[in-house]
Amino acid sequence: GVPVTNLIAANSSFRVAMLFFAAVNVTAFVLTIFFIPSLPTMGTVPYGKQLGVLKKPAMLLSIVIVVFLNGAIFGFYSYISDFFGTITKINASTISLFLMFYGIANIVGNMIAGKILTVNAKLSTFVLPFVLAAAYIGLFLTGRLTAATAICIVVIGALAGINSNVNQYLITQAGPEAPEFSNGLYLTSANLGTTFGTFICGLFITAMDTRYALMGTFIFVAVGFVAILLKMGMEKSIITANEGGKNVEWKM
């Protein structure tokens, strides 16, 4: 939606772009009413039980992971059009095309995520920060080259889709007894990550230039990876304690 809207705005006017955006939203609303089935209710979960998931160390660490990994991706994404214009030096139409590549790759990433999480969720979570860091390093080093930037953006778009699924998995896995509340926590954590990531990346832009917004991304990826290590270490200690026949208070 965003790339197409940008393309329309670049070739016509802001008014036409907003009309297109409104038409898409109305269409989605109508399709939701007539084609999305009602889901059966599973009963109301008491508020105390829902809030209780916030006492779980696994949930708290999952929230930290989501905030920082999502901040890493969308903190930079907030400035990606400016990056294309000032660093890669491409015109508005090409920027819209690049954003469309990103969006399509994001959809592909969602499909990939479903498969890799089914095969090995823990390994997928562990590897994700490394691949993210490598993709952003590639963009930092080759951002002035149009073809190389296009390749990096496709990879980053796919990783953004994978990241969203991994993040939601981490939150819901940590709070299965309150699925609706956990889903709300995921959305809140993701939005917080976008807010903080945009702020930090913006500071680097103010101090240097748009290219160095990626430094904020590297920081967020690093902190997210540390949180992943802490969560995995905690899970391992709980498994070890359970195997030893000890009583464990933490629930994963």
Model-derived features with residue positions:
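Extracytoplasmic gate region of multi-pass secondary transporters
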Residues: 58-100, 104, 121
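Juxtamembrane intracellular "pre-TM" segments in multi-pass secondary transporters
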Residues: 35-65, 250
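C-terminal transmembrane helical hairpin of 12-TM major facilitator-type secondary transporters
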Residues: 122-167
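Helix-to-loop junctions at the C-terminal end of transmembrane segments
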Residues: 9, 108-121, 205-206
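Helix-loop-helix hairpin linking two adjacent transmembrane segments in secondary transporters
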Residues: 1-36, 79, 83
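A membrane-interface helix-boundary motif in multi-pass transporters
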Residues: 7-23, 203-222
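Multi-pass alpha-helical transporter architecture, strongest
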Residues: 31-35, 218-252
